[in-house]
């Protein structure tokens, strides 16, 4: 009986973090800290903003967990933010990782935060290689965001450099996203 209950709970927890087509590794699964506080984020948002963390790249789940914890510690302890800044992050392993998630406003693009979700790739894409599994994960996540009503069907995709004075999301990501259907120059 206990094993059936444990299995049921595991299925429920996993389904909570399953987007329409892409599995999202929960903050608890990657060892993230709880937010100090949150601010709600609406539905049918107009923008998705793509970033890179400009730090360490990761290729395995264990490496990505460590990098995520480091990014979160920097955001919370050094910058004084209540949580990691992005809604979702994508590792070199092709996994999508929960940051602030679907319903909490991020801290990734100043005045754009209330109107957007922030998706960041772990690494520095001025020199790190953007792999096909990472591109696929990001595109699936964006499609899921539309299907679940988080992004409007006519959302606009920006690279961080379009809304702030920065090199983010790095040259390799920048060159990639300019070919995506929702990107706007």
From Swiss-Prot:
GO terms for molecular function: N-acetylmuramoyl-L-alanine amidase activity; peptidoglycan binding; zinc ion binding. Its cofactor is Zn(2+). It is found in: Secreted. One of its GO terms (cellular component) is extracellular region. Keywords: Disulfide bond, Hydrolase, Immunity, Innate immunity, Metal-binding, Secreted, Signal, Zinc. Zn(2+) binds at residues 51, 160, 168. Disulfide bonds join 58-64. CDD domains: PGRP. Pfam families: Amidase_2 (PF01510). InterPro entries: Amidase/PGRP_sf, Amidase_domain, Peptidoglycan_recognition, PGRP, PGRP_domain_met/bac. Gene3D superfamilies: Peptidoglycan recognition protein-like. Its EC number is 3.5.1.28. Changing residue 6 to T: In strain: KY038. The record marks 86 as: Essential for zinc hydrate coordination. Residues 1-21 form the signal peptide. Residues 46-170 form the N-acetylmuramoyl-L-alanine amidase domain. It catalyses: Hydrolyzes the link between N-acetylmuramoyl residues and L-amino acid residues in certain cell-wall glycopeptides. Belongs to the N-acetylmuramoyl-L-alanine amidase 2 family. This is Peptidoglycan-recognition protein SC1b. The gene is PGRP-SC1b.
């Amino acid at each position: 009986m206990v094993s059936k209950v444990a299995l049921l709970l595991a299925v429920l927890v996993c389904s909570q973090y399953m987007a329409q087509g892409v599995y999202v590794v929960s903050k608890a699964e990657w060892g993230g800290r709880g937010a100090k506080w949150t601010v709600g984020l609406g539905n049918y948002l107009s923008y998705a903003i793509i970033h890179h963390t400009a730090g360490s790249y990761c290729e395995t789940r264990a490496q990505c967990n460590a990098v995520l914890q480091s990014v979160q510690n920097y955001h919370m302890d050094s910058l004084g933010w209540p949580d990691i800044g992005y809604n979702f992050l994508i590792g070199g392993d092709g996994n999508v990782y929960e940051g602030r998630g679907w319903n909490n406003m991020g801290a990734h693009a100043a005045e754009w935060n209330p109107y957007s979700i922030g998706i960041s790739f772990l690494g520095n894409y001025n020199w790190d290689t953007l792999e096909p599994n990472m591109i696929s994960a990001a595109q699936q996540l964006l499609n899921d965001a539309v299907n679940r009503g988080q992004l409007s069907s006519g959302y606009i995709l920006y690279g961080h450099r379009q809304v702030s004075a920065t090199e983010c999301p790095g040259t390799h990501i920048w060159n990639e996203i300019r070919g995506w259907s929702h990107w706007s120059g």
